[in-house]
Amino acid sequence: MSWGTELWDQFDNLEKHTQWGIDFLDKYAKFVKERLEIEQNYAKQLRNLVKKFCPKRSAKDEEPRFTSCLSFYNILNELNDYAGQREVVAEEIGHRVYAEIMRYSNDIKGERKSHLHEGRKAQQYLDMCLKQMDNSKRKFERECREAEKAQQSYERLDNDTNATKSDVEKAKQQLHLRTHMADESKNEYAAQLQNYNAEQHKHFYIVIPQVYKHLQEMDERRTIKLSECYKGFADAERKVIPIISKCLEGMVQAAKSVDERRDSQIVVDCFKSGFEPPGDFPFEDYSQHIYRTVSDGTISTPKQESLKPDPRMTVGKAKGKLWLFGKKPKGPALEDFSHLPPEQRRKRLQQRIDELSRELQKEMDQKDALNKMKDVYEKNPQMGDPGSLHPKIAETTSNIERLRMEIHKNEGWLSEVEGKVSQRSERRHSAEANHLVAQGRESPEGSYTEDANQEGRVQPQHHAHPEFDDEFDDDEPLPAIGHCKSLYPFDGNNEGTLAMKEGEVLYIIEEDKGDGWTRARKQNGEEGYVPTSYIEITLEKKQ
């Protein structure tokens, strides 16, 4: 199938078809450009959306690290990566499809113009040959008519008896001249005819088929280029599918990481005050005086009245605690956090101690480095003056002493808080025990007996030195609340941390309080803190 043989007489239609092909190419290029702009705008809008909803937190922000919030932030990160992949798609389409198709469109326009010009030039040359042949044909026809007239004139004069010999001779010469001119025009016409036939054969069997062949090849290349662009368009999407799939998988994993129990525990850690709920108001039996008067005719004052709690004191204490369920009174922030509830105060003090400990470790490391540098300078004076390090060493020493004093002061406050919490718990258990004993000794009349010795046995005995209790408590290890598997190795160089290897299984004895550290225990009983992000935790289900 060839345009040169099948469409030898369809030059105008082929010209229109090739122009339509170029117009369609430009139309597809416009489509790709608009598709490219859509991808760019989509990626830009996604990035703006992520930027809008990403947390803008300062270094001092103490936003609770809820798993639902962390999951959402991870989803935003994955969405940001997804937007980056849309930008990659736009870039691929721009370079591999749009730029290529625009370059090819310009090339094919020039090539088409050249082929059509060659076809028109061949047609013009054939038309010129036809015109020359037609002119020679008319001349030959005219000369033949003139020769025929000359022959008729000669024959008429030759048969005329009245004609002179000179007239006959003159007519004869004219006949020979016209006959000669007719022969020459005949030869010229024959030559022009032969030439035109040859050029026409060459035109329709060689020149035009060659031109049409080039046009056909050009149009087929245009079709192939469109096919390649279609495929490149799809390949640009296909290349990013694996990464987009990872982004979507990351979103799914972020959704699975939401732990409602952990979020509930974070709420407890953030807002737990450490206070005990208000106690019950005691029943004050004013009728017992009436019953005693009716039964024995006397009015007596109960001996256990001194054991009754003062209603005014009870109400006062209750009112002092009821702010937990209402609006918390605001007060100035104190250095020892005494304006905070006990549990929050303990947490803030522990955080400050941890921060001061890290600063202390940095200062000690800096002091060690300065001392080593000083030793090097003393051994090699050409490297530096040891005396130049004395101010810096003195400053570091002063900072170390200051930090140690701060840590000691905060540890004292922390011990005070923990002691108060422990005493409050003991008083609660003591009150419960007294309440049970008092119920056992209550008389049917609503009065109390005077068994003071029994009350003495029920009262719990408090240690004079509560710090001894802490020492005994440390001997008994904390119970494990779950286990974990280390995902990465951790050297545990800092004080209080626990070194672990990758894949090592540990017991969890204390959950992350929101500072990024989890307390764990090894199989050999060694305890310490490990980074929460380095382990995979499995907590025991609470019965």
From Swiss-Prot:
Entry coiled-coil feature ranges: 66-258, 334-426
Membrane topology classification: Peripheral membrane protein
Alphabetical keyword list: Autophagy, Cell membrane, Coiled coil, Cytoplasm, Cytoplasmic vesicle, Cytoskeleton, Endocytosis, Lipid-binding, Membrane, SH3 domain
Record domain F-BAR: where: 1-263
Site location (Mediates end-to-end attachment of dimers): 165
Cystine residue pairs: none
SMART domains with a match to the protein in the record: FCH, SH3
PROSITE patterns documented for this protein: F_BAR, REM_1, SH3
Cellular localization per UniProt: Cytoplasm; Cytoplasm, Cytoskeleton; Cytoplasm, Cell cortex; Cytoplasmic vesicle
GO cellular component, one term: cell cortex
Domain remarks in the Swiss-Prot or TrEMBL record: The F-BAR domain binds the phospholipid membrane with its concave surface. The end-to-end polymerization of dimers of these domains provides a curved surface that fits best membranes with around 600 A diameter, and may drive tubulation.
Entry's family note: Belongs to the FNBP1 family.
Assembly information from the UniProt record: Homodimerizes, the dimers can polymerize end-to-end to form filamentous structures. Interacts with GTP-bound cdc42 and wasl/n-wasp.
Protein name, per record: Formin-binding protein 1-like
Biological source species: Xenopus laevis (African clawed frog)
Species classification: Eukaryota, Metazoa, Chordata, Craniata, Vertebrata
GN (gene name): fnbp1l
